[in-house]
């Protein structure tokens, strides 16, 4: 069974501040002999993608981490890769996590979102670039176009665990702008630098996140169009909400692979073959786009943004609403693990 946001093409470099390397490595499906299982330095940037992430020119594999969290293990081991910063020349680590598992074993409602975000924060991540294949809900968003969404409508059904604050620890966080505006600007800058070479980028868009794993009915697809929906997937939530609770800057990059099922007489309805064909055809553009964003983020000038200083500490107050005597012991321990020093 496949679903949008499940398979993402291998990531390579781009011409937007190109990498000074040509060698590529493959992210392993099992631990490679001699690869460390620990990494001592904090890792501030992460990529969450599908099982298709398989090679990254310019990166060297530094470690493969099996992280345990109070919410269980994440969807996959975390691969730590390094490349030299284009401004300082120093090695910069980037974490990679496969949303649906190394073998694509987690359906959208089974993705271990809490463990994924908790594990990334625990190793130091404060910026996440997420990737998703999407269906287009508008004529102008063509298959193979990229979209940097700025809003989400939640059409999941409460099946997926969607908060860290529950069972005796209440916390509320703002989600008016579900994606980080400053991070989005960097993503757009890199995308526009590639336009004219097969890349078409839409700066904004309303993303509908549905439950899945089935695709939409025609009535649903047309309803979402009347709401102003631009694209639709099954992966943005609760991932983005949990990232906000974890004080992590988050932006998703979407690649359209189909027109869902609203267009024409039904002969163009989304199917797995259609999705895979467009992803394969657009793989090189996706690699270049992703590589450009990562290379830009590792520049020294973006240090404050990458550390998410603009949202640091927001949960210290928002998550401390429950008085000490009313807190669930297990819930408090979990949050103390996620936010050391916040709720002591």
Swiss-Prot record:
HAMAP family: MTAP (MF_01963)
GO biological process: glutamate biosynthetic process; L-methionine salvage from methylthioadenosine; purine ribonucleoside salvage
Reactions accelerated catalytically: S-methyl-5'-thioadenosine + phosphate = 5-(methylsulfanyl)-alpha-D-ribose 1-phosphate + adenine
EC number: 2.4.2.28
Assembly mode: Homotrimer.
Record bears the keyword Cytoplasm: yes
Gene source species: Phaeosphaeria nodorum (strain SN15 / ATCC MYA-4574 / FGSC 10173) (Glume blotch fungus)
InterPro entries, sorted: MTAP, Nucleoside_phosphorylase_d, Nucleoside_phosphorylase_sf
Residues the UniProt record annotates as site (Important for substrate specificity): 216, 272
A single MF term (Gene Ontology): mRNA binding
Name of the featured protein: S-methyl-5'-thioadenosine phosphorylase
Superkingdom classification of source: Eukaryota
Cross-referenced Pfam families: PNP_UDP_1
Family recorded in the similarity comment: Belongs to the PNP/MTAP phosphorylase family. MTAP subfamily.
Pathway recorded for this protein: Amino-acid biosynthesis; L-methionine biosynthesis via salvage pathway; S-methyl-5-thio-alpha-D-ribose 1-phosphate from S-methyl-5'-thioadenosine (phosphorylase route): step 1/1
Chief location of this protein within or outside the cell: cytoplasm
Sorted UniProt keywords: Cytoplasm, Glycosyltransferase, Nucleus, Purine salvage, Transferase
